[in-house]
């Protein structure tokens, strides 16, 4: 029965590594990396989950269960969720997402190849009864909360308010010594904070059409392959058939930095690898990564790496002695 419940809520592909009482540890199937999930079954219908992924994607598809509400908080990394309707939503570090799991997803991936976060999973009918019994003096209508945040079919994605972020931080701090009573109080606190959150805090959903997300991903991969190539934004828009404003905002939403900040970082990483080799002059390395002016290259390198190219080369030579 317990295994059937796990598969119903979390999918059939997870591997149980350890179980004792309300605690379960799972290995998640990932593409090109590893993932694990810790689950605390606090009450019937109320789960607290910690997730960590060092991978590009998780291969477990979310089940379609209309009564399940998922409250995700991203601590580190980026989370991309592709909906079968053909749109993409993104959760960034410090963001919170509320989603009804009756809205199917076809895949989940991590654009930065890393993700760490926590989630509260509520089976609304069971959770409503459990919380009412555990906290009889608290007025909390989970269906009304779901309607307020998600409406008739949307997901809610926004930056955490400072107090919600602080409450999740408490859960992260206690992860390895978590007690059920403490966890349950923090879960209740988060639900009440969401209930009482001002209307102006419930902003729009940063999602993008599939062709935009795929175009931005292609741009990202092209930069990784050819960091020395610098194209004006107009040419990038023409190449990927995306408008300037959307291209800039989508790239930052997915990868957490501007196009040209990412380009500069890739160039400096390539330059650092060449400097460690020791064979080329700094001027030649600057030209290799797209800089005609060695002084501008040195300034850019210092901005990313914290030291000048010559200092970087010298420090690497000293380490090899």
Please state what every model-predicted region is.
Residues 82, 88-213, 233, 238-244, ...:
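Alpha-helical bundle regulatory/interaction domains
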Residues 247, 251, 296-297, 301:
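Short hydrophobic/aromatic patch on the recognition helix
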Residues 50-52, 70-72, 116-123:
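Short hydrophobic beta-strand segments that form the core of ligand-binding sensory/regulatory domains
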Residues 217-225, 229-230, 234-237, 253-295, ...:
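Terminal helix-turn-helix DNA-binding modules in bacterial transcription factors
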